[in-house]
Amino acid sequence: LAPGGATATAWRMADEVWDAIDREAGTGVRLSAAEHFVTITDHELVTSRGIHARDVSTHLAVEIALIARAEAGSSDDEAETFRPVEARRLADLRLSAHVAEAATFARDTLRAEATPTHDGAVVIASGALPALFDPFLFHTGAQAAVMKLARFAPGDRVTDGGDPLHLASDSTRPFGLGSHAFDGDGVP
């Protein structure tokens, strides 16, 4: 967290969003709404066998809605885009980059047209990849396996053909959204 705690961190997040919006001035994009969330969690685990462990973690989330207009003052041609951003550290939020990308997306939406039928390679923007892989992350996780909901086991093929897709997860990665000293059951 920023010096000064959760409140100071929330203000720094808001300032970064406003600064990024100011850089979009004159492009037809404005901020419609923004919400900032700072959560500090302090877990303490004490067992009858003498184990005593503590895990203090942060979770930062920002939700940004931007509106692009084709012409200044006109509400006939508008496009809105919503961007949720989450991280454990302020530096990992990269709010300026997310605002710039969302502003570009909103402007591009104004010019978007239906594409002709296409047979070939498809390029997926970096922002779309997390949503694309969310089901794989769930089905390869230990929680889904224990709950008997996992579709995949180690070594299983994800697709019937084509190039293999190898998925790996590291819950010990520092400051990952799912990285903690121990889970809710006290397992390290």
Question: Model-flagged regions — what are they?
Answer:
Residues 1-180:
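Active-site bordering "gate/hinge" segments
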Residues 183-188:
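Short, intrinsically disordered, charge-balanced linker/junction segments flanking boundaries
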